[in-house]
Amino acid sequence: MKDKIIGYCYVVGDILHKGHREHLRNCKAMCDILFCGVLSEKAVLEKKPKPILPYHERFDAVRPYADVVVCQDEYSPLSNCKAIKPDVLFESTSHKEQLANNYMKSIGKRIIALPYYGEQSSSMIKEKIRGKQNESTK
């Protein structure tokens, strides 16, 4: 039996949209077992505003797209990569987490940067909602 390729990706997963789904499907297509880290609220707040959806809802929304869903309690996936030791770390071209990338290279593993889906983002959706709310209060 051949060794299975283990992949690791991570998302905030707030307002799961087409870009998230495509990213997760692409990650899954390139490995046999996909671990997906869902960032805890604490992790998100290291670099972004507080998510609209609570952690448990974001966790559940990601479940259909990964074999194993785990909590990522830091913005960097480094701790989870050290614990899981995936063969592949999936990143987005919109950002690359240097510490985790350096670690993966140091243990002879791969980093694959998948294209950012620029047509839609959680931030764009939130801005649209805010705009509509502002219009309705005028």
Please tell me what each predicted stretch does.
Residues 1-138:
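Nucleotidyltransferase catalytic core that binds NTPs
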